[in-house]
């Protein structure tokens, strides 16, 4: 279906707004994926706070112009599905990576974070805020426990020397 100029401008404006508010973006090719599977992916994306859109490449190039996702323009070939992570930088990458494991036709093209092209796997493995805090607390707890053990060992050694 042919789009008139107003429709094209609306699409560019909508994608540009999504890009400006996003933390990261992931680009994929969804050729060969069934409508049922794509519907499931869209539902999962909404739940994860990810904005997804299939956009013509020329419109997508205009939409990301001047944003930190302009570095992805080389990946805009063929049918392009773009997802913007709004809440966590790794949300879209994690969602697409999991989806690609079960759908061999789904091809990940690239990702961007903080104005640079990134590996999709790198973004997918970024810990969430809660996971990062848990890791930090675990490290701090281990350090404190280790210091306590070393203190008791030093005290034991000192008492053995005195005896």
Curated annotation (Swiss-Prot):
Superkingdom assignment: Bacteria
Gene Ontology molecular-function annotations: large ribosomal subunit rRNA binding; structural constituent of ribosome
Assigned GO CC terms: large ribosomal subunit
Keyword entries, A-Z: Ribonucleoprotein, Ribosomal protein, RNA-binding, rRNA-binding
One GO term of the biological process aspect: translation
Matching Pfam families: Ribosomal_L10
Keyword rRNA processing in record: no
Zinc in keyword set: no
Family from the record: Belongs to the universal ribosomal protein uL10 family.
The protein's assembly and partners: Part of the ribosomal stalk of the 50S ribosomal subunit. The N-terminus interacts with L11 and the large rRNA to form the base of the stalk. The C-terminus forms an elongated spine to which L12 dimers bind in a sequential fashion forming a multimeric L10(L12)X complex.
Function in brief: Forms part of the ribosomal stalk, playing a central role in the interaction of the ribosome with GTP-bound translation factors.
PANTHER family: 39S RIBOSOMAL PROTEIN L10, MITOCHONDRIAL (PTHR11560)
Name the record gives this protein: Large ribosomal subunit protein uL10
Gene, per the UniProt record: rplJ
